[in-house]
């Protein structure tokens, strides 16, 4: 699946497929983007913003996540709050910039090869246990947390979204070839925590 001319939202965070993100929108270009997405029942791509030489010069990662808005509200601080669901990872091509500074691009869905979920999950019972403990934690807001414990993709993406990893570490998990590679990388990160 390829979508042409889709809005990009470069952020200092990585949104992982199957997970939810709450965002506060304040820049006019992104408020307009949200309005347009709501009117057209379409989504946008969250991509990692990469810092370059100085604060005003940044790059956009070529891999991101297509998201759809599932909730919005006006926050007490006057900002627009939105909750997005991350649908799938994408490869970004042909980036252009509109007059208002909003970036648009072509986005092609990246589908991981099928794996033997049960075999992968059996290799990583420690990761499943950590995720189960986190999901059961009383401070966990599980309003949008829907983990499929029979899916290596779901387990790896949700666990990565809940533990303290850097944006670059999360980006490496997003860019992993498949769930097997992602679980191995995640396991190595957890050993360092």
Q: Which residue stretches match the model-derived regions?
A:
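Positively charged
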Residues: 1-145, 154, 168, 172, ...
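Core structural elements
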Residues: 148-165
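Amphipathic alpha-helical segments within well-ordered protein domains
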Residues: 160, 171-174
